[in-house]
Amino acid sequence: MALSRLLSTSKSKVLYDDLSEESQKRVDNKNRKSLALSKRPLNQGRVTIDQAATMLGLEPFSFSDVKVNKYDMFIAKQDYSVKAHRRATFNILVDPYWFHQPLTHYPFFRVATFAMVWIGIKGRASGITTLRIIDKSYVNSSDQVEVEVRYPISKNFAVLGSLANFLALEDKHNLQVSVSVDDSSVQNCVISRTLWFWGIERTDLPVSMKTNDTVMFEFEPLEDKAINHLSSFSNFTTNVVQKAVGGAFTSKSFPELDTEKEFGVVKQPKKIPITKKSKSEVSVIM
C-alpha cells in the first residue's frame, strides 16, 4: 500500500521564485545596504568594539589590555604617639613592602577600607582631638577634607570607613592625615597612642565606588581582675572588639565638655552629584 503511494503518478508542485526582476533588484539593494550598515563602527553596537577600533585605526586594541583586576591584599599600618598641644600631618602609607609588591603595575589606588584606633591615656583630660583625612589635590580647603572626626582625647575609640575615589600613584603625596589637639588641661606629655590601618586597593580602571558611611566605636574600660595571671590576657583582643562593636555610632554628645560642639563623624566622604537637565533646558537644546 505504501509502495503504491510512492510510485503513484500524481503531479507534484514545482517550487520557483515568484519575484520579478525589479523586486529582486530591490531585495539585493536592501541586502547590500544592511551589509554596509553592519560594517559601520558607529552603529549602536552592531559591530564589536574591537572591530570598530580596528576600522578607526586604533589597532591593536582589546579590553584584555585593561587590567581591571584589583590588587587589594595590601594592608599598611602606621603607629604614632600624640602629644598635647600638637598639630601634626603625615602621609598615608600606600606602597607595600618589597615582598608584597604585585607582579603587575597598577597606576591608580584608593583606600578601600581604613581603621583608626585612638587610645587615650589621660583619663581626666578635657581636651578635644580632630582627625582629618585630606586630599591636598583640591584648592579649596573645605573640599580637601574627605573624613573628619572630632572626639574627646580622654576616650578610647575607633573609626572605620573607606574612600570612594581613586588617586594616581604619582599623586600619593597628596593623601594625608591631619591630627590636631585642643587641650589646656594637660601639658608636656603624650596623651594617646594612635594606630592606623589602611586597606589599599589598586587598579588601572579607576571607576569610583559607592560611598560608605564612616562609623565609630567607643571602647569600654576592661575589667581589672586577676591581672597578675597571664591567662587573663588570652582573650584580650576578642574582649575589646566585642565591647566596641556593641555600639556603633556616627555622632555623640558630651554636655559636660561642650554642648555647642558636635562629637563623632563630622564629615563623610561624598561626591558632587550629577545634575539632570530639566525638560525646559532639553527642549531649548533640541
Curated annotation (Swiss-Prot):
Pfam families documented for this protein: Tenui_NS4 (PF03300)
GO BP annotations, alphabetical order: transport of virus in host, cell to cell
Flavoprotein in keyword set: no
Residue runs in coiled coils: none
Keywords: RNA-binding, Transport, Viral movement protein
InterPro entries (alphabetical): Tenui_NS4
GO molecular function: RNA binding
Keyword flag RNA-binding: yes
Family note: Belongs to the tenuiviruses pc4 protein family.
Role played: Transports viral genome to neighboring plant cells directly through plasmosdesmata, without any budding. The movement protein allows efficient cell to cell propagation, by bypassing the host cell wall barrier.
UniProt protein name: Movement protein
Species of origin: Rice stripe virus (isolate M) (RSV)
High-level lineage: Viruses, Riboviria, Orthornavirae, Negarnaviricota, Polyploviricotina
